[in-house]
Design a protein with these regions (language model features):
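Catalytic/RNA-binding core of pseudouridine synthases
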Residues: 4-166
Length: 166
């Protein structure tokens, strides 16, 4: 895909595979920063997870993470957050069309999320932990598809080189 063509996909639906680590939080909502709080997970079970997921389907108000590229007075939010400055971002409307629990083991959930442009999966992980009366952060993230383009149809660099130079 050419750079120019990539812009037309930005507004399209995206699908992600993610792993949330339950029982802890980080300031960045992912593994980029150290754990800042530990929570009990003894009350969390598969049924509770399934009930919690229902709260994340449809239109939602989401507050982006402080560690994001959103600009505040000309500076990236993450630059301010890394300096320890207090960052306050406004909530945004997002839409989650699917949230599928794939696996639950060792206080980690693997899930598949289909969502709108502007959705921060890190914020979903953090909010998910709050809904469980625990904590959570994003441990792993893979964008599976955007619009009709998916990883299954993507070329590896090796395959692309062979196509171009053979």
């Amino acid at each position: 895909m050419c750079i120019r063509d990539s812009y037309k996909y930005q507004n399209q639906k995206k699908t992600y595979y993610a792993t949330f680590k339950l029982g802890a939080t980080t300031p960045s909502y992912d593994r980029e920063t150290e754990i800042n709080e530990i929570f009990s997970t003894s009350h969390i079970n598969i049924n509770r997870l399934k009930i919690c997921i229902k709260n994340f389907i449809g239109e939602l108000d989401q507050i982006p993470p402080a560690f994001s590229a959103i600009k505040i007075n000309g500076k990236r939010s993450y630059e301010l957050a890394r300096k320890g400055e207090n960052v306050s971002l406004n909530s945004r409307k997002i839409f989650i069309s699917k949230f599928e629990l794939l696996n639950f083991k060792n206080c980690e959930i693997d899930c598949k999320i289909e969502c709108s442009k502007g959705t921060y999966i890190r914020s979903i992980a953090n909010d998910f932990g709050k809904h469980l009366n625990s904590g959570a952060y994003l441990k792993y993230l893979e964008r599976y598809s955007i619009g009709r383009l998916s990883i299954e149809n993507a070329y590896s660099l090796d395959k692309l080189e062979k196509q171009l130079f053979s």
